[in-house]
């Protein structure tokens, strides 16, 4: 639920436009999938996805240049006008235009990416916050959104690839932060272990993640599993990088063997 404050009073504002970016993209209007008339255009929805990602007003020139980058400027702007017409039912209340710049109304739109950023921007975020942020993800950023609009939209596809890389890095950083935070919160160790497992499934060569998982398992009283994780680390480093574990990892292994962790 969103709120606004006027004169010290708190007023509830109904969230009616939900936009999902962290996985297969979705737009729901008052709880129902958004269907545009007379044409349920993927490009029109891509405009909303772009604005939801940007989080700031964007010019018509920018939007036309992205989604019709292979077309002459005049034609691109003409196509953009047609797509914006399909979105006319959302204008003012959800889609705002001021001085030729378009943006989404934060008072009436709920965007999972904005919530992810809100939960992770605090450097002292608790494990529960970071876990909530990670549960917003259900796949690749804007998974499959380019289907049907790649033709003539090379710059949009390029932008999409950059965004995917950046937000995937943010997701993995959050997983690592969650695991680190869990070392200081014994009742959240299970969340940290799960985060390490997910990270290593994607990047088995990350030795620091293996160490973190070893420490978490040891703190959880799972000494045998912690030592087994060292073996998995050794195998992964040899397979992926052709190197043995570092002195730091070996020292942690010795500490666990001695019951010092």
What role is predicted for each listed range?
Residues 1-194, 198-207, 221, 225, ...:
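Intrinsically disordered, low-complexity protein-interaction/activation regions
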Residues 83, 212, 229:
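Residues within the DNA-recognition helix of helix-turn-helix
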Residues 167, 230-234:
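Amphipathic alpha-helical coiled-coil/heptad-repeat segments
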Residues 213-217:
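TPR/Sel1-like alpha-solenoid repeat signature
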Residues 238-246:
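A short glycine-centered flexible hinge/capping loop motif at secondary-structure junctions
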Residues 249:
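Short conserved active-site loop signatures built around small residues
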């Amino acid at each position: 639920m969103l709120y606004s404050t006027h004169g010290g009073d708190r007023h509830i504002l109904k969230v009616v436009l939900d936009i999902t970016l962290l996985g297969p993209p979705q737009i729901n209007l008052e709880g129902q999938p958004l269907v545009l008339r007379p044409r349920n255009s993927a490009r029109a929805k891509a405009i909303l996805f772009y604005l939801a990602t940007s989080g700031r007003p964007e010019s018509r020139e920018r939007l036309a240049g992205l989604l019709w980058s292979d077309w002459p400027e005049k034609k691109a702007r003409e196509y953009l006008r047609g797509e914006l017409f399909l979105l006319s039912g959302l204008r003012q209340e959800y889609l705002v235009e001021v001085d030729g710049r378009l943006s989404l109304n934060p008072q009436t739109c709920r965007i999972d990416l904005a919530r992810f950023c809100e939960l992770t921007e605090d450097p002292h975020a608790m494990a529960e916050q970071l876990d909530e942020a990670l549960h917003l993800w259900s796949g690749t950023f804007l998974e499959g959104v380019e289907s049907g609009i790649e033709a003539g939209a090379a710059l949009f596809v390029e932008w999409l690839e950059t965004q995917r890389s950046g937000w995937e890095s943010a997701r993995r950083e959050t997983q690592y932060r969650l695991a680190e935070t869990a070392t200081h919160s014994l009742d959240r160790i299970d969340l940290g272990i799960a985060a390490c497992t997910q990270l290593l499934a994607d990047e088995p060569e990350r030795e620091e993640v293996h160490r973190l998982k070893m420490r978490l398992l040891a703190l959880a009283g799972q000494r045998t599993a912690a030592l087994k994780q060292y073996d998995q680390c050794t195998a992964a480093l040899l397979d992926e990088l052709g190197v043995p574990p570092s002195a730091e990892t070996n020292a942690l292994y010795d500490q666990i063997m001695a019951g010092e962790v």
